[in-house]
Every structure is written in C-alpha cells, then in structure tokens.
Amino acid sequence: MNLKDKNIIITAGGTGGHIYPALAVAEMLRENNANVTWVGTPNSMEANIVPEYFNMQYIKSSGVRGKGLKRKVAFPFTLISSTLKARKILKKLKIDLVIGFGGYVSGPICLAAVQKDIPIIIHEQNAKIGLTNRILAKLATKVCLAFDVEDIQKRLSPKQLAKTQVVGNPIRKDIIALNNKTKNITENGKLKLLVLGGSQGAKSINNIIPDLIIEANKQGISLKVWHQTGKLSFEETKNNYNQVPSTHIKDISAYITDMTNAYEWADILICRAGALTVSESAIAGVPAIFIPLPSAVDDHQFFNAQNMVKNNAGFCIRQDQMTLENLIDIIKPLYEDRDKLKEISQKAKNTLIKDSSEQILKAVEQILNKK
C-alpha cells in the first residue's frame, strides 16, 4: 500500500528499548511514503536521537509510578496540560493514525487521539506489559505484543485480546540480515565473548568479567572479550583489566557503535535482558547468558529472558547468583562442545519473529483502509 498523504505520529520515549523499535517502524512507514512525525519529551533520550531522522514535536510528560507525593499530586495537572498540547498537534498535522511504543509520553498523545476519534496502535516490547500500555490497551484499535506470554494475556480482557496480535520486536534491517547468514561459531581455540554492560553501565557485570577471564583460563577455558562497559564504569573497568593478558582482550570501550559487527563477531554474550537486547541477540543468533536488572519494573527483564530459556535458546542467572562458578558452569560445556553452541545459536534465530515491522505496517494499512 502506498501511504502517500497519510499523516502518522510515532510516540515513544525514555529508553532505547522504546525508541529503537519505534525508529525501525518509522523508517518503514517513510519508505511507504507516509508523513511521519515523532512526539517525545524535551531533554530526553529521544530528543537526542530522533531529530536526525524525523521531524519531532514535544510535549511535557512524566510518570507517577513509584514517584514522591509531590509528583503524584502534580501528575493529573501535567496529564491534562500535555493532553491538550497533544490535541493541538493532532489537529495541526491532520493526523490519521497514532502508534505508541510505550514510555510516559505515549499516554497523552494516545489519549488525545482517542478523544479526537483517531485510531491508535500500541506496541509492548517486554514480556510484562507496562503501566501506560496497560491503560491504553483498553482504548487502542490494535494491540501489538513482542512476546506470546500468558502473563500479558491474563492482564487483558477478552475484548482487548480480540484486537491483540503477537508481532515481535521491530529491529534494524542490518541485524535482521544476520539471521539469514550462517553464524560462524569459532571451531576451536578462544571463545569470543561479547559483554554488554549497557549504555549506562552495569557495575556488577563489569566487575566480574575480568575475574571470569582469569578463572576460566585456569580451568582450561580460553576466552577473548569485547566489553562494552557503559560511560559510568569505563575507567574503573578498564583498570580492572590490567590483570588480564592482552591476548584475551579484543576491545574495552564505553559504547559499541556498530552492534551488527559485534553480534557477528561474538560466539557468546553476557548482558542484561532488556527487550531490545534479547530480540537483537536472538535474531543475530548469539547465544546469551542474561543477567536481568533486579530493579526492572515488574521484574520484566527476567520474564524477557525466560522466552529464550524455555526454548533452550539462552541462559539466565539472577544477579545475586552471578558467581564465577555459575558463569563457568554454563560456559565450560559450550567451550568444549562447539556443536552445542551452534545448536543454541540456531534455536535463538528461530525463537523470535523476524518481520515485526512488516506486520505492524500491515496493521496500519488495514486500519487506514477502514477509515
């Protein structure tokens, strides 16, 4: 379908887990000639990323969950104000459809769309549905889920389930391309370990990896590491690697700019279990040891990881159980049996949906055809 003259708003913000899947869909909509505008909040992650690619409008928005009394008292007034601003944006741009990818900013713009009888699609990236999306699911024309999990189904009414579709997480085309390539697991010698401490860093993961390299080597397990530390932990982590022989280090950096290259290089991955990381690593076929962030809302990272574990396509260790012994217990059998590693890699590739953006595009077409 040619979406020429169709005006669509994408709204997502707060974290990369919301923003990057939304960007993948926004790019596909633009390829199909839609006029795409992004609505986010000022002084935010999306404000730093999105304007390079799309026209952006701003509204002030904030959450209420877990906040102090002052924020909770102010929340209704902030919501009313931001919804009124959102209504003006919808009218000015003559919007035909709104797609919300979560984050607080999705609330006001989607509520305003409902008030103006503009259809909305929401997409939930995690295996636990977020508060904003849980509310919007009652109002949405279409509810798209990344994971087919019983917990989300329990939280939705039969009416909401009738308009729900599992579509996976939209990810970048260059990473999807890895799914169609044979994953080259190192046949012998050093196992290539990619460590993602997160863009902001994960101190517990960063601290244990240098010791893991040394202890594994003592047990006859030779690892070569490429470590993203995050900005906050870079200097400390780099210093910790002074005890590790340079032959076991590919690179230590605050941030990896070319994740496609990193996934293609890696034999195995240690990382958090944010929705984007789980989806990208699976599609790329990189067997992962997930260390869920303990403070994640509703423990959603643990449940994200379980989608891989239950399919024998990944591993999960709680942070308080992340010991050298437990890590080596997972890595050693894979080091000794590379065919097993290849098997897990293939299972990871086959676990998640690969054409998520296309499925959302099809939903957009179906809704706009009915208008």
UniProtKB/Swiss-Prot annotation:
One of its GO terms (molecular function) is undecaprenyldiphospho-muramoylpentapeptide beta-N-acetylglucosaminyltransferase activity. GO terms for cellular component: plasma membrane. Pathway: Cell wall biogenesis; peptidoglycan biosynthesis. It holds the Pfam family Glyco_tran_28_C. Coiled coil: none annotated. Keywords: Cell cycle, Cell division, Cell inner membrane, Cell membrane, Cell shape, Cell wall biogenesis/degradation, Glycosyltransferase, Membrane, Peptidoglycan synthesis, Transferase. InterPro entries: GlcNAc_MurG (IPR006009), Glyco_trans_28_C (IPR007235), GlycoTrans_28_N (IPR004276). UDP-N-acetyl-alpha-D-glucosamine binds at residues 15-17, 126, 172, 199, 256, 275-280, 301. One of its GO terms (biological process) is peptidoglycan biosynthetic process. Its EC number is 2.4.1.227. It catalyses: di-trans,octa-cis-undecaprenyl diphospho-N-acetyl-alpha-D-muramoyl-L-alanyl-D-glutamyl-meso-2,6-diaminopimeloyl-D-alanyl-D-alanine + UDP-N-acetyl-alpha-D-glucosamine = di-trans,octa-cis-undecaprenyl diphospho-[N-acetyl-alpha-D-glucosaminyl-(1->4)]-N-acetyl-alpha-D-muramoyl-L-alanyl-D-glutamyl-meso-2,6-diaminopimeloyl-D-alanyl-D-alanine + UDP + H(+). It is found in: Cell inner membrane. It is a peripheral membrane protein. It comes from the Bacteria. Cell wall formation. Catalyzes the transfer of a GlcNAc subunit on undecaprenyl-pyrophosphoryl-MurNAc-pentapeptide (lipid intermediate I) to form undecaprenyl-pyrophosphoryl-MurNAc-(pentapeptide)GlcNAc (lipid intermediate II). Belongs to the glycosyltransferase 28 family. MurG subfamily. This is UDP-N-acetylglucosamine--N-acetylmuramyl-(pentapeptide) pyrophosphoryl-undecaprenol N-acetylglucosamine transferase.
